[in-house]
């Protein structure tokens, strides 16, 4: 399977497992899991041609580790990023590192400067330990801006942090007082 095919399957899995399982007639459990065989069967019935082996290759090679297979390999879920109401993944609460980062686009800064970071249609704000990863996320939406989050300060103030299966840090919101603009970059 080539990179283009893997990317197409990955985009489909992200859409279905994060946002619209009903688009293929799937039902996810409360933790976001569905049966691999059912997913592959319904994907093929909806015009997407891939098998279990291709799905497993996508899971294994995905750089951002967007998907998790159950220990027995029979179920799959998106690691984080859900917007569907029926999924309420119980991520493990953890103490974060002192600083985390969020990448956004300059066009969103006016809103961020008044509201802080909010989850929007997702369940959580996504943060990373790696500034470069945050910048690459910001580039997807326009001229990137790198924001630093005083995670230690937030945690000490009683804010809960969670970490998804793929290492992404999750928090309900980041009030403006915990944010610092690190850099504007020209793409």
From Swiss-Prot:
Its EC number is 2.7.1.-. One of its GO terms (biological process) is tRNA splicing, via endonucleolytic cleavage and ligation. Keywords: NAD, Transferase. Disulfide bonds: none annotated. The keyword NAD applies. InterPro entries: Ptrans_KptA/Tpt1, RNA_2'-PTrans_C, RNA_2'-PTrans_KptA, RNA_2'-PTrans_N. It is an enzyme of class 2 (transferase). It comes from the Bacteria. GO terms for molecular function: NAD+ poly-ADP-ribosyltransferase activity; tRNA 2'-phosphotransferase activity. Gene3D superfamilies: 3.20.170.30, RNA 2'-phosphotransferase, Tpt1/KptA family, N-terminal domain (1.10.10.970). Belongs to the KptA/TPT1 family. Removes the 2'-phosphate from RNA via an intermediate in which the phosphate is ADP-ribosylated by NAD followed by a presumed transesterification to release the RNA and generate ADP-ribose 1''-2''-cyclic phosphate (APPR>P). May function as an ADP-ribosylase. This is Probable RNA 2'-phosphotransferase. It comes from Pseudomonas syringae pv. tomato (strain ATCC BAA-871 / DC3000).
């Amino acid at each position: 399977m080539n990179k283009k095919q893997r990317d197409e399957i990955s985009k489909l899995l992200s859409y279905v497992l994060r946002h619209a399982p009903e688009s293929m007639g799937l039902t996810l459990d409360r933790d976001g899991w569905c049966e691999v065989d059912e997913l592959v069967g319904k994907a093929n019935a909806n015009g997407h041609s891939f098998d279990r082996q291709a799905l497993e290759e996508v899971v294994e090679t995905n750089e951002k580790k967007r998907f998790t297979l159950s220990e027995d390999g029979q179920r799959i879920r998106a690691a984080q990023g859900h917007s569907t109401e029926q999924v309420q993944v119980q991520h493990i609460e953890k103490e974060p590192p002192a600083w985390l980062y969020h990448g956004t686009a300059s066009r969103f800064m006016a809103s961020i400067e008044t509201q802080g970071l909010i989850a929007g249609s997702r369940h959580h704000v996504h943060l990373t330990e790696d500034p470069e990863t945050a910048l690459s996320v910001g580039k997807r939406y326009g001229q990137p801006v790198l924001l630093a989050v005083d995670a230690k300060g937030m945690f000490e103030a009683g804010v809960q942090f969670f970490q998804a299966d793929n290492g992404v840090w999750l928090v309900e919101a980041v009030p403006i007082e915990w944010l610092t603009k690190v850099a504007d970059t020209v793409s």
